[in-house]
Amino acid sequence: MQAMDSATSQINQLSERIRAAASDKTPLRICGSGSKDFYGLRLQGEPLSTRALSGIVSYGPSELVVTVRAGTPLAELEATLASQGQCLAFEPPHFGEGSTVGGMVAAGLSGPSRASVGAVRDFVLGLEMINGQGELLPYGGQVMKNVAGYDD
């Protein structure tokens, strides 16, 4: 329960910082480890790190479902999956040891298997994000497996 309270507190702090920046019209640069800073346009604004929002929330190997936070190192997720003989089928590229799950999803980069298995976006069942106004928005959600397949 303490981990959940900590995550809720961190999310509230991020939301408040984003609301304040929106009110002041201060640009923010959302970042995890910064491993993809070279990718795309040059980033500007005050850094807002998601690194503290880290950890694997839940993992059901038999259900093939894992819930992780944005700041979770990609290597940590892959090691957890490998311990159960599983992997990320879309083979996300690593741009440094600190690459995070949030960066993987935000950049949408997939490896050579993308053509046959799909991209990272095809494996995301749901997410919660904070928009530019500091509001927490849920998309998708938890799924439960029944005998016919997956249902919300």
Language model: regions and residue ranges:
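FAD-binding subdomain of flavoenzyme oxidoreductases
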Residues: 97-152
